[in-house]
Swiss-Prot record:
Belongs to the MCD family. GO terms for biological process: defense response to fungus; innate immune response; killing of cells of another organism. AXPX repeats lie at residues 25-28, 33-36, 37-40, 41-44, 47-50. Its main location: secreted. This is Venom peptide 3. Keywords: Amidation, Antimicrobial, Cytolysis, Fungicide, Immunity, Innate immunity, Membrane, Repeat, Secreted, Signal, Target cell membrane, Target membrane, Toxin. Coiled coil: none annotated. GO terms for molecular function: toxin activity.
Amino acid sequence: MTKQSIVIVLFAAIAMMACLQRVTAEPAPEPIAAPIAEPYANPEAIASPEAKDLHTVVSAILQALGKK
């Protein structure tokens, strides 16, 4: 490897490290739940009548996949 190649590789590594440092410094956005999923987010909602529909759908999918 020539000196020029080594210098180019070092500058590329420094640039990559600087970019990674900038990316990790920015906080990740908070995930936003879909409006339809929000009623099922708390434990009390699992016992609600609306949750029965969700349970029926999940059970049907699992049965279609051959699981109980």
